[in-house]
């Protein structure tokens, strides 16, 4: 059990740092491209991991840990609320559509591609 917690912690530490860099580099305009990038790529990678049926150790380190901290639901919701409050309705709809539609599509694509590595 302690080794599982350590794996999740190490992965989470690394994932959070990588997400921080994406946000700092890409979230400079009206549309939060950094958050969009980490959430879409995270959906794809987690789908690929699930499709590949990786070991528990790898899943804890990379899936639960790294990708759990790399992707962000709370920041997404905050940014969506901010777009609405700033009356950026078109950007809100675009951001929401790309995030949810793209996330589901990329998770499915990742799962399908990952299944070739079983």
Swiss-Prot record:
Catalytic activity line of the entry: fluoride(in) = fluoride(out)
Keywords: Cell membrane, Ion channel, Ion transport, Membrane, Metal-binding, Sodium, Transmembrane, Transmembrane helix, Transport
Membrane association type: Multi-pass membrane protein
Major location (coarse): membrane
A GO CC term attached to the entry: plasma membrane
Regulation: Na(+) is not transported, but it plays an essential structural role and its presence is essential for fluoride channel function.
UniProt keyword Transport, yes or no: yes
Keyword Transferase in record: no
Role description: Fluoride-specific ion channel. Important for reducing fluoride concentration in the cell, thus reducing its toxicity.
Single Gene Ontology MF annotation: fluoride channel activity
Lineage, opening ranks: Bacteria, Bacillati, Bacillota, Clostridia, Eubacteriales
InterPro entries: FluC
TM segment ranges: 2-22, 31-51, 56-76, 91-111
Subcellular locations according to the entry: Cell membrane
Name this polypeptide is given: Fluoride-specific ion channel FluC 2
Residues given in the record as Na(+) binding sites: 68, 71
UniProt record, GO biological process: cellular detoxification of fluoride
Organism: Desulfitobacterium hafniense (strain Y51)
Family membership: Belongs to the fluoride channel Fluc/FEX (TC 1.A.43) family.
């Amino acid at each position: 059990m302690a080794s599982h917690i350590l794996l999740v912690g190490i992965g989470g530490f690394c994932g959070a740092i990588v997400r921080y860099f994406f946000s700092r580099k890409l979230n400079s305009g009206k549309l939060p491209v950094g958050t969009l990038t980490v959430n879409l790529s995270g959906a794809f990678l987690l789908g690929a991991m699930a499709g590949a049926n990786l070991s528990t150790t790898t899943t804890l380190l990379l899936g639960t840990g790294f990708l759990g901290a790399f992707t962000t639901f709370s920041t997404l919701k905050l940014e969506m609320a901010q777009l609405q409050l700033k009356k950026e309705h078109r950007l809100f709809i675009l951001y929401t559509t790309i995030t949810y539609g793209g996330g589901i599509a990329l998770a499915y694509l990742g799962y399908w591609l990952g299944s070739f590595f079983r």
